[in-house]
């Protein structure tokens, strides 16, 4: 019996007590982790929109405005690098006629125009005049 008693005492010493604790539902943790992983994605999209998409959209609108305002007699530059003077603007089919040399005219799409060089030259001349006035005003003082 003494062996049995020793075994019972050993078993009593080896027992583990289990305590009940509150169990947090796993769904709450997964929902929170899902939202926290979504926040960086939303921030990346916002940065992408403000740095890339929005400026591109404004450039596209400026280009459409430029193309729609082309008039006869203006010097233009096409996307293929050809300079010419607009001789005819066709509103209904989006084409314009450009004279690239004396009696040499080509027909191109309005969307092929990348710059109206006559306007660019006017702006450059105005800036040059303002600069000259400031310099001459400074010398007079």
Curated annotation (Swiss-Prot):
Subcellular location, principal: membrane
Q: Which spans are transmembrane here?
A: 33-53
Q: Where in the cell is it found?
A: Cell inner membrane
A Pfam family assignment = YajC
Keyword hit for GTP-binding: no
Q: What are the protein's UniProt keywords?
A: Cell inner membrane, Cell membrane, Membrane, Protein transport, Translocation, Transmembrane, Transmembrane helix, Transport
Q: How would you describe this protein's topology in the membrane? A: Single-pass membrane protein
Q: Which InterPro entries match?
A: Preprotein_translocase_YajC
Q: Biological process (GO) annotations?
A: protein transport
Q: Does the keyword Cell inner membrane apply?
A: yes
Q: Which GO terms describe its cellular component?
A: plasma membrane
The record describes the protein's role as: The SecYEG-SecDF-YajC-YidC holo-translocon (HTL) protein secretase/insertase is a supercomplex required for protein secretion, insertion of proteins into membranes, and assembly of membrane protein complexes. While the SecYEG complex is essential for assembly of a number of proteins and complexes, the SecDF-YajC-YidC subcomplex facilitates these functions.
- PANTHER family, A to Z: SEC TRANSLOCON ACCESSORY COMPLEX SUBUNIT YAJC (PTHR33909:SF1)
How is this protein organized at the quaternary level? Answer: Part of the SecDF-YidC-YajC translocase complex. The SecDF-YidC-YajC translocase forms a supercomplex with SecYEG, called the holo-translocon (HTL).
Q: Which family does it belong to?
A: Belongs to the YajC family.
What this protein is called in its record is Sec translocon accessory complex subunit YajC
Source species, please? Rickettsia conorii (strain ATCC VR-613 / Malish 7)
